[in-house]
A protein has these predicted regions:
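Amphipathic alpha-helical blocks and their helix-capping loop/short-beta junctions
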Residues: 220-263
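Peripheral docking tails and interdomain loops at the edges
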Residues: 184-234
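Cofactor-cradling patches in redox/metallo enzymes
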Residues: 130, 134-192
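Long amphipathic alpha-helical segments
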Residues: 1-87, 247-267, 279, 291-361
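Conserved hydrophobic helix-helix packing surfaces used for dimerization/oligomerization
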Residues: 98-100
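Intrinsically disordered, low-complexity tandem-repeat regions
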Residues: 267-288
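Short terminal or interdomain "cap/linker" segment that borders an active site or interface and mediates
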Residues: 365-382
Length: 382
């Protein structure tokens, strides 16, 4: 047990509820801690729900859970956050309102961290408006003008969304509204948040609430360090993305069978030039062909999405001029592949294939070289 009163047994029970998508059990356990267990709602959100959701992601990454099971567990976590927040009594604060607009970066669909942040801020007496996932700069600007928040809290989980987050930060700053950034996508200790011009950074919801209470009202003090040359190379990578994706798919077609050229044609003959005589056989063949086609299409989509994320991480690393964005994605990819019995060394083939196509882009070339060194390091150590 720790200072919050949440025991290991309670954590195990909550994990089991998520694993079984047991909405009733999860809500009863979490809300009970608040209403009769003497645990604060904030501690339940940050000491029980948030760590459990991290473990959910780890189980998907390791291949233990399917995407569907991960989504079902996340749904239960979202319901739990709402129920715990509703069960808690929000303090009534005297004085002028403190308005916070909470949003996810453009392209970011990991909404639960921002959801938890919004509820923790409400519990601390802030007035919160939450916009949910993937808010474009124009949409964000429109809401800022309509609601007039004192600060925008921007959540980013995936590093390849950093260039899009930069546009949102710049949009808010042009409107005269400071930005607090949070989430693992902004790097260790918020290094990339500050590089993008954020005014504040918080590692978690408790730190965010504390920072805002300590420095209220927040002020514009951030400054972007993104360089013009990096923006130019990033834009070139974005323009060439379809071409580079096709090149990667060809180079890695033996690793991702679903990326191999597919034919939608079918041959229902019996091999002698005559059509199959059995209607049942024809139906079975059609069903089998449809199933195979669907599986192939799914493999193709998953493989293309995966390669696309690697490309986007390369582009984001170039944008912020920090190879750790790319090597971090390579680390995830290597673990993802290893858990699924795919040879992680195929990532070396990917970096080489990209390097062949991007010789004239110095920042991109340096980032790929850093990625290759990272991939080769375990072999060197052996």
């Amino acid at each position: 047990m720790n200072a919050t009163g949440i025991t290991d047994a309670v954590r195990a029970d909550f994990d089991a509820c998520l694993a079984d998508a047991d909405e009733g059990g999860a809500l009863e356990l979490a809300v009970g801690l608040v209403t009769s267990g003497g645990v604060s709602a904030e501690d339940v959100l940050l000491g029980l729900v948030a760590p459990a959701q991290v473990r959910v992601g780890e189980r998907w990454e390791s291949g233990e859970w399917t995407v569907a099971r991960e989504h079902a567990a996340t749904h239960v976590s979202r319901l739990t956050v709402d129920a715990v927040a509703s069960a808690a009594r929000t303090p009534v604060e005297a004085g002028p309102p403190r308005q916070v607009l909470v949003a996810c970066s453009d392209g970011e669909w990991h909404v639960l961290p921002s959801h938890i942040l919004a509820e923790v801020l409400r519990l601390r007496g802030f007035q919160v408006r939450s916009l949910g996932g993937s808010i474009s700069p124009p949409e964000l600007l429109s809401d800022v003008h309509q609601t007039g928040p004192d600060v925008v809290a921007l959540s980013c989980t995936l590093t390849f969304n950093l260039p899009l987050a930069h546009r949102q930060i710049e949009t808010c700053r042009c409107a005269g509204v400071p930005v607090m950034a949070g989430g693992p996508g902004f790097g260790p200790e918020g290094v990339w948040a500050y590089a993008l011009g954020a005014d504040l950074y918080a590692a978690d919801a408790r730190a965010a609430a504390g920072a805002l209470l300590h420095r209220w009202p927040p002020v514009l003090c951030g400054e972007s360090s993104v360089q013009a040359g990096a923006v130019e190379e990033y834009a070139a990578l974005v323009r060439r993305r379809p071409e580079l994706l096709a090149h990667l798919a060809y180079a890695l077609r033996d690793v991702f069978p679903g990326l191999r050229p597919r034919s939608d044609g079918s041959d229902n003959s019996d091999g002698s030039g005559n059509s199959a005589t059995s209607a049942t056989s024809a139906t079975s063949a059609t069903s089998a062909a449809s199933a195979a086609s669907a599986a192939s299409a799914r493999e193709h989509e998953e493989g293309t999405d995966f390669l696309g994320r690697l490309l986007d991480s390369l582009a984001a690393a170039v944008f912020v001029d920090d190879a750790r964005v790319f090597t971090g994605q390579l680390a995830f990819a290597a673990a993802y592949f290893a858990a699924r019995s795919v040879e992680p060394r195929c990532l070396l083939a990917m970096t080489d294939a990209l390097a062949d196509q991007l010789r004239g882009s110095p920042r991109t070339r340096d980032t790929l070289s850093a990625g290759r060194r990272w991939l080769a390091a375990p072999e060197t150590e052996d």
